[in-house]
Design a protein with these regions (language model features):
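Alpha-helical structural segments
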Residues: 4, 8-15, 19-20, 33, ...
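Residues within the helices of the helix-turn-helix
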Residues: 23, 28
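Append "Primarily bacterial transcriptional regulators
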Residues: 29-33, 41
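Base-recognition residues in the alpha-helical recognition helix of bacterial helix-turn-helix
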Residues: 38-46
Length: 61
């Protein structure tokens, strides 16, 4: 998937964290919020920890 889709997933993850907190963060919820096909976020970030690390790295850029 293009980098734009990955960025859309990260934006959706940040929005989800802000709106509902870290306990609400899941790959499926990020996919849904970003309007991506199921499994997209898992493809880029295999674990929840990797997803959180990706968010931190993306924000730091």
């Amino acid at each position: 998937m293009p980098a734009a889709s990955r960025e859309r997933a990260l934006e959706a993850a940040v929005e989800l964290l802000g709106a509902e907190g870290v306990r609400a963060l899941s790959h499926a919820r990020v996919d849904e919020r970003a309007a991506l096909p199921p499994g997209s976020t898992s493809n880029w970030f295999r674990t929840r920890r990797a997803l959180l690390g990706g968010i931190v790295d993306w924000i730091a850029e």
